[in-house]
Curated annotation (Swiss-Prot):
The gene is recR. Keywords: DNA damage, DNA recombination, DNA repair, Metal-binding, Zinc, Zinc-finger. The keyword Nucleotide-binding does not apply. One of its GO terms (biological process) is DNA recombination. The lineage of its organism: Bacteria, Pseudomonadati, Pseudomonadota, Gammaproteobacteria, Aeromonadales. This is Recombination protein RecR. InterPro entries: DNA_Rcmb_RecR, Rcmb_RecR, Rcmb_RecR_Znf, TOPRIM_dom, TOPRIM_RecR.
Length: 200
């Protein structure tokens, strides 16, 4: 069904968000216009501001409004010498929410994918290589996604780290906590068996 051209444009624009199809976009647009106009205006203002003002940290490449993000600006995060490499700022947020990591990050903003034209330069690996040589990094933790591209990216970076004399580790992959073995796919189970840990 056709609505006003502006409403149609609004619904198409909402579909750029992940998981939002035509029906969800229509529901969101109608909600904003029917009963959330002030919230919609606030959202529009914040979106405009965020898209204009938020850039990348010059040190780790995560999102920030400043030259350096809060994590990179915090000297306590340098003390243990840990550097964790992730694919996206969302991965930084996920790790930070665990409260288990107190080191620093490097955000690739993707993974190696020659077919899509994404090579080492697009991932800022020259910046990472410089950090490996110039900073006191005791261990590089590779937390790329457990995909073919994520694994290839991890191996590429591991070679770089070894060449710089930095210890390298990869986050564990496997059976989720509370999961049942019979429901786990073969690849995940295989990774779990290969990455098994001794019980002390």
């Amino acid at each position: 069904m056709k609505f006003s051209p502006l409403l149609d444009e609004m619904m198409k624009a909402l579909q750029v968000l992940p998981g939002v199809g035509p029906k969800s976009a229509q529901r969101m647009a109608f909600t904003l216009l029917e009963r959330e106009r002030s919230g919609g205006l606030r959202l529009a203002q914040l979106l405009s501001r965020a898209l204009t003002e938020i850039g990348h940290c010059s040190h780790c490449r995560t999102f920030t409004e400043n030259e350096r993000c809060e994590i990179c600006a915090n000297p306590k995060r340098e003390e243990n010498g840990l550097l964790c490499v992730v694919e996206s700022p969302a991965d930084v947020a996920a790790i930070e929410q665990t409260g288990q990591f107190s080191g620093r990050y490097f955000v690739l903003m993707g993974h190696l994918s020659p077919l899509d034209g994404i090579g080492p330069e697009e991932l800022g690996l020259e910046i990472l290589e410089r950090r490996l040589k110039d900073e006191a990094i005791s261990e590089l933790i590779l937390a790329t996604n457990p995909t073919i591209e994520g694994d290839a990216t991890a191996w590429y970076i591991a070679d770089m780290a070894r060449a710089a004399g930095v210890k390298v580790s990869r986050i564990a992959h496997g059976v989720p906590v509370g999961g049942e073995l019979e429901l786990v796919d073969g690849t995940t189970l295989s990774h779990s068996l290969m990455g098994r840990q001794p019980l002390n």
